[in-house]
């Protein structure tokens, strides 16, 4: 299922062409543990670009490890259904109860570098997140709350404001890509 999703995805930029190629290579190299954190080189994760129905606001959280405003998301932890992972992570990390995929198709993909850090008292070596991103929609009137062991705040941002709120230059590029795609979708409303 995962291989088919990645193979079926049509990249529209060089970053995605190369990242897609490498994800497929990693699937071949690590067939047994690419979905789990047991693979300390690279493993799959899922993220969500959560927009309101008007598609002019995006839900972000202040990530405790990265010390930056970021999208919700998390590790596959053995789960091959990464859309399901993205939905679960949004609910867990933001308190949002009602949300839906704008489409079940992959919205973007990217290989993200993760620096060494300490999580729950354990040292985590530098590694790669093979990340699949899904476009989700939620009513921005819903109550949100943080998940203190992972983030310290959750709030809605205007699209441009969300990009600027990130303190990670490499993630600003990703968030801008997602916003640019959203602008293209607004005309055709999925």
Residue positions per predicted region:
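Generic N-terminal amphipathic, Lys/Arg-enriched alpha-helix
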Residues: 1-10
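Short histidine-centered beta-strand/loop micro-motifs
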Residues: 59-61, 74, 145-147
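N-terminal strand-loop-strand
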Residues: 36-71
